[in-house]
Each structure stands twice: as C-alpha cells, then as structure tokens.
Swiss-Prot record:
PROSITE patterns: ASX_HYDROXYL, EGF_1, EGF_2, EGF_3, EGF_CA
Name of this chain's protein: Protein disulfide isomerase CRELD2
Gene (name only): CRELD2
Pfam families: EGF_CA
Location in or out of the cell: Endoplasmic reticulum
SUPFAM superfamilies recorded: Growth factor receptor domain (SSF57184)
FU repeats (start-end): 193-240, 253-302
Provenance organism: Homo sapiens
Length: 353
C-alpha cells in the first residue's frame, strides 16, 4: 500500500539544494533545514512510541503494537505531525522529500538506523557527518573524531560548506588549536590532548598559576623581587589626573574620578576630601558645606520687603508675589496702586496766598 501524496514528488531535492539568496543570508542553510526535519521526525517516533491501547490483554497488545511499530499508519501519524499548518517552508520541504522518508521507513530503517546520516548526508548530500566538512565531506583539521583537538570549532563542521580551518576557543591558537595564547600556559600536552590554563592577571606570559610564575609582566604591573606586582600610577609625579579629579588605583590600571562639586581640588571622593572649598561653601565638621547666606548676621538682600532664598553655593533675592520690583524696594500692591492714583502736585494760586 502506498501513502497518499500531498503533491507530485520530484526525485531530486531541489528545494534543499537551492543556495540561500544574498539578502537572506541569515536564513537556515539546506543542512539546517534537513536536520530540523529529521529532528522533528525523530521526535514524532518518540511520541508515537508511547501510544498504547490499555486494554489489559497483553498478548493482543503485543501483537497489535508490534504491527503498529513499523506500520504505514504510524508513519502517516508522524508525517502529519511534522509541520504546523502555518509553516510554509516546512510543509514545502516535506512535500518534496516525503518519498525518501517513506522509503527509509518501510525498507531501509533496519539497515540505516541513523535517519540523519542516511537522509541528509548520503541521500540528499546537503550535510556531512560530524567532524567533516565541505562538498566532499573531508575530515576537519585534527581528524573527524576530535576536530581542532577538541579546543575549537571546525569551519563547516557537519555541513557541505566551510574550509575545515579551526576557530580556536579562548586561550588556544595554532592550526590545530594546540598552542597557548599569551596569558595562558600549557598545563597538559600529549599526543592527543592539549590544555591551556589562564595565567595570573599580572602575567603576560607564564609557566604556572601565580604571579611568581610570570615570564613577562602585563602592562600596569612590574617585576619586584621575583613577582609581578601592581604599579600604583596614582603615586606618580606629576599626577595622572587633572586638578578637578582624583586618582583611583586598580590592579594593573587606574581611573580618574571627578571631585565633589563643592571642591577646588581633592584627594578622594565626597566633600570630606576637598583640598579647598569652592565659593559659596565653607569647611564645617571636616567637609565643605554650603554657606546659608540668608542666615548671616549681615543682611544679604537689602531692598525693603525682599526675600532671601538659599541655593547650593549661592542665594537669590526675590520680591514676594504681587509686589512690584523697583531698584530700591519691593513695593506692596496697595502702595503701588495709591502711587499710581495720585494727581500731580499743583502750585497754590495767587488768590489762595
């Protein structure tokens, strides 16, 4: 019995072999698409393997389930569950490759139990076996069993792409990723394995884990009595930071931090480390504090009715709401109105004298 076809099936995997368009460079490669279909098929096998009839008749169940295990009915259930109805790309791929999947299920599964190897590598030829790469599935650098000596990634590993070169993990370098980068040392190396371990942070090169095993000190460190120790850049003369900053030493480096806004020069963070106080601030209890000019014995705002408001490092003089501001005073509303309503002063007439 043949399974119903969703569409006319081609023998060549045209869809999977089409190269991705330049504008769609991030789309899955043919190998990724094939692997995804196989992963879904394998999951379908797991899901349908759990199926049982729960009737309690063991002999009947064994006979029935045995037939179901390799039946076309089970295959159809797996195929029907591979793609969501909205997944156009998955459904299109399945239509193109359903005949291959049917042939493997009904005839070749026992001989080729690894569906990925048979379907994606040998039949469609869009993938390679792990540890191999390129159109001819050549072995990666270091061999297919341990590409890049286990310390890197082989370009094109498992696909028909790439050049087989190694992209080494952090700490490793060389064509086979067996050499250690600066900042790492070889803690194990034999014919099959190479392990690079990070040096102490003070070492540029090293032969062991401590700051006494450095071959060369990192920038910001200096050799002192056989060990690489931190250079205190903040103790240098002249100081490395500007007059409005203070220096903060760190392992192998330093930072320049801004002084508090109340300071003119400083030795550290906050108003308690000012060298001098900025105008509007004065030393109080060991730190620069704002001077409240409005509370001074000598009056700060001298115009009549004027209010004084303190601000950080300064003050402002303001007339109350509704008062008219003049050069000499803040005039209350009633006085201002009276002044505006007065007639000009007239000289007395001769008759009045």
């Amino acid at each position: 019995m043949r399974l119903p076809r969703r569409a006319a099936l081609g023998l060549l995997p045209l869809l999977l072999l089409l190269p991705p368009a330049p504008e769609a460079a991030k789309k899955p490669t043919p190998c990724h698409r094939c692997r995804g279909l196989v992963d879904k098929f394998n999951q379908g096998m797991v899901d349908t393997a759990k199926k049982n009839f729960g009737g309690g008749n063991t002999a009947w169940e064994e006979k029935t389930l045995s037939k179901y295990e390799s039946s076309e009915i089970r295959l159809l259930e797996i195929l029907e569950g591979l793609c969501e109805s909205s997944d156009f790309e998955c459904n299109q791929m399945l239509e193109a490759q359903e005949e291959h999947l049917e042939a493997w299920w009904l005839q070749l599964k026992s001989e080729y139990p690894d569906l990925f190897e048979w379907f994606c590598v040998k039949t469609l030829k869009v993938c390679c076996s792990p540890g191999t790469y390129g159109p001819d599935c050549l072995a990666c650098q270091g061999g297919s069993q341990r590409p890049c000596s286990g310390n890197g990634h082989c370009s094109g590993d498992g696909s028909r792409q790439g050049d087989g070169s190694c992209r080494c993990h952090m700490g490793y370098q060389g064509p086979l990723c067996t050499d250690c980068m600066d900042g790492y040392f070889s803690s194990l190396r034999n014919e099959t394995h190479s392990i690079c371990t990070a040096c102490d942070e003070s070492c540029k090169t090293c032969s062991g884990l401590t700051n006494r095993d450095c071959g060369e000190c990192e920038v910001g460190w200096v050799l002192d009595e056989g060990a690489c120790v931190d250079v205190d850049e903040c103790a240098a003369e002249p100081p490395p930071c500007s007059a409005a900053q203070f220096c903060k030493n760190a392992n192998g480096s330093y930072t320049c931090e801004e002084c508090d806004s109340s300071c003119v020069g400083c030795t550290g963070e906050g108003p308690g480390n000012c060298k001098e106080c900025i105008s509007g601030y004065a030393r109080e209890h060991g730190q620069c504090a704002d001077v409240d000019e409005c509370s001074l014995a000598e009056k700060t705002c001298v115009r009549k009715n004027e209010n004084c408001y303190n601000t950080p490092g300064s003050y402002v003089c303001v007339c109350p709401d509704g008062f008219e501001e003049t050069e000499d005073a803040c005039v209350p509303p009633a006085e201002a109105e009276a002044t505006e309503g007065e007639s000009p002063t007239q000289l007395p007439s001769r008759e009045d004298l």
